[in-house]
């Protein structure tokens, strides 16, 4: 996500120590061979100017290569091989923990049955219009921590900002609809990573620990689930390891 220079600046300034911040990076889809994973991690560390990551994730279960002529070219590398490379990274001390992103239940079960080190985290899309309850519950049952990306939706692709339930709760608690959406997942025991570089938004996003939604309010938000996925990566839909099902009618 090209934040290496920002990380370098803040650490070089002395305002924060390395141990004061949590830094996650991901192994991209064109580095899924076991021998490539270590090199990809080292490149990330070099770009960030770091000696280790707090968390390193397999970005997607499906691998591919970028063909200059034909574009995306599906790779037949199994994510089980990729995970062996992730275990190598962990053993080498380049990442304090390793995990996955966008893995479904079947893929996690297969990974658990064939790994030496279980993933610590599964990062996937979770927001009030996609509560992903089944996957969240499965991860919790396996002691896999859930991190939610797009926890307040994505750009103009959702109507979360106008949802009556979120708007009503925002008035009650004197918060924004986005803060209500973030608080919803926090109370589910889910970490959230809203994407912004705006300072005011950063402050707003962290200002969600001075109130608590009631049980009925949590249920009301859960009930607005539309199974509305906003990140689909359509270019890889034909890959055998594509993790998402077609939306229900």
Predicted regions mapped to residue ranges:
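N-terminal binding-site loop/beta-alpha segment at the start of enzyme catalytic domains
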Residues: 1-21, 38, 152-155, 247-249
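Short, well-ordered amphipathic alpha-helical segments that serve as non-catalytic structural scaffolds
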Residues: 3-6, 36-45, 82-85, 165-166
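Acidic (Asp/Glu)-rich catalytic clusters
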Residues: 4-18, 45-50, 112-115, 136-142
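A short, structured active-site edge motif that brings together acidic residues
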Residues: 17-31, 55-61, 123-126
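Active-site mouth loops of central-metabolism enzymes
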Residues: 26-35, 71-75
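Short, acidic/polar
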Residues: 33-48, 106-108, 130-131
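CE4/NodB-like, metal-dependent polysaccharide N-deacetylase domain
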Residues: 37-58, 88-92
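Beta/alpha (TIM)-barrel catalytic core signal, keyed to glycine-rich beta->alpha loops juxtaposed to Asp/Glu
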Residues: 60-249
């Amino acid at each position: 996500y090209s934040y290496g220079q920002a990380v370098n600046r803040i650490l070089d300034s002395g305002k924060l120590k390395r141990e004061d911040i949590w830094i996650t990076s991901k192994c991209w889809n064109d580095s899924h061979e076991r021998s490539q994973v270590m090199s990809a991690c080292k490149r990330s560390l070099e770009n960030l100017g770091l000696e280790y990551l707090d968390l390193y994730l397999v970005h997607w279960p499906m691998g591919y290569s970028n063909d200059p002529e034909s574009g995306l070219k599906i790779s037949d590398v199994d994510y089980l091989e990729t995970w062996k490379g992730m275990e190598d990274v962990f053993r080498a001390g380049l990442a304090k923990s390793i995990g996955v992103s966008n893995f479904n239940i079947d893929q996690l079960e297969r990974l658990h049955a064939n790994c030496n080190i279980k993933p610590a985290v599964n990062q996937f899309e979770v927001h009030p219009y996609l509560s992903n309850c089944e996957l969240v519950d499965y991860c919790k049952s396996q002691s896999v921590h859930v991190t939610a990306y797009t926890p307040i939706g994505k750009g103009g692709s959702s109507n979360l900002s106008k949802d009556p339930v979120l708007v009503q709760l925002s008035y009650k608690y004197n918060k924004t609809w986005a803060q209500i959406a973030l608080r919803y997942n926090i109370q589910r025991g889910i970490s959230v990573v809203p994407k912004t570089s705006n300072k005011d938004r950063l402050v707003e996003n962290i200002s969600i620990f001075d109130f608590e939604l009631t049980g009925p309010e949590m249920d009301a938000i859960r009930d607005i689930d539309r199974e509305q996925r906003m990140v689909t990566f359509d270019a890889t839909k034909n890959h055998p390891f594509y993790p998402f099902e077609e939306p229900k009618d």
